[in-house]
């Protein structure tokens, strides 16, 4: 089996999800997808959502400092036809100021048609990506937390596989009294240690900064995140994701957001001009009880279909 034919088939299948130039130059782009349904709902990019939410281990390792002890979390995301994204995490306190967590993520692309250079069918092959991580976070002061995640990443395409090591570094400043949360994250530092064949490829490094602001004496909270701050080949607006929450008491929220990059990447030209067909827009809601939490988010990450994200967390 020729890896060239296999990779071409996979690229053609996944191309609508990776329209940007930076995606086409990196591997393991499933790491760019949101895991948190709440993050998905407020624009698909967020690193400053400082809540008791175990899914933030996938977005900013510093934020597990605010997660309840012994919290287990299960997640599911629909993607394009035949593909699924599942993940899980567990958070444990380790003293008054430190926390640790473990996480795992699987993107299964299902069975994909393989063809020759002359479009002759050679049957089907499977492809999947897996990331397994360990996280440590520490409260440096009463308002500042830092965290690190070390990830082992593997990808299999038919009979070929690759391995990589990735590091996430995060910091968060949280002022509860004034409703401010500010964060900075460097995601996916590292690289491949085993290539599919002979050529090593880059993993999707992303430098991000973000802010969340709760309007005091109001149910409104706003979010803004700047991503891919080392790539300025694209317009400034494409680096921005924004969102807002309506907090209905202490336990329920409604959320909406907009991601300018997704809207432009997945815009489709038609007779009336260019239309994103809902790409960029996201919605969601969640409920938090004493031990049980349920979050649901909706957004578009592939031109062929929208995605539904479901998070379930339980504190033991």
Question: What do the PLM-derived regions correspond to, one by one?
Answer:
Residues 1-7:
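Bacterial N-terminal signal peptides that target proteins for export
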Residues 15-16:
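N-terminal signal peptide c-region/cleavage motif recognized by signal peptidases
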Residues 22-316:
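Subset of outer-membrane beta-barrel
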């Amino acid at each position: 089996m020729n890896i060239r034919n296999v990779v071409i088939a996979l690229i053609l299948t996944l191309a609508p999800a990776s329209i940007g130039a930076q995606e086409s130059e990196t591997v393991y782009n499933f790491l760019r997808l949101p895991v948190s349904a709440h993050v998905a709902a407020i624009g698909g990019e967020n690193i400053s959502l400082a809540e008791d939410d175990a899914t933030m281990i996938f977005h900013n390792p510093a934020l597990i400092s605010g997660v309840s002890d012994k919290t287990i979390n299960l997640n599911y995301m629909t993607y394009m036809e035949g593909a699924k994204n599942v993940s899980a995490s567990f958070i444990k306190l380790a003293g008054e100021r430190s926390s640790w967590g473990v996480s795992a993520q699987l993107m299964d692309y299902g069975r994909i048609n393989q063809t020759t250079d002359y479009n002759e069918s050679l049957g089907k092959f499977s492809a999947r990506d897996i990331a397994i991580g360990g996280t440590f976070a520490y409260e440096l002061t009463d308002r500042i937390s830092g965290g690190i995640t070390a990830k082992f990443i593997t990808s299999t395409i038919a009979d070929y596989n690759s391995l990589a090591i990735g590091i996430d570094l995060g910091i968060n400043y949280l002022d509860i009294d004034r409703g401010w949360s500010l964060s900075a994250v460097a995601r996916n530092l590292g690289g491949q240690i085993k290539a599919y064949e002979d050529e090593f490829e880059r993993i999707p490094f992303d430098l991000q900064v973000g802010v969340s602001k709760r309007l005091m004496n109001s149910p409104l909270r706003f979010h803004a995140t700047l991503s891919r701050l080392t790539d300025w080949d694209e317009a400034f607006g494409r680096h921005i994701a924004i969102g807002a929450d309506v907090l209905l008491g202490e336990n329920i929220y409604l959320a909406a957001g907009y991601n300018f990059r997704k809207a432009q990447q997945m815009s489709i030209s038609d007779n009336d001009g260019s239309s994103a067909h809902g790409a960029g827009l996201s919605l969601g809601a969640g409920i938090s009880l004493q031990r049980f939490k349920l979050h649901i988010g909706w957004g578009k990450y592939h031109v062929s279909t929208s995605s539904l994200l479901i998070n379930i967390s339980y504190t033991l």
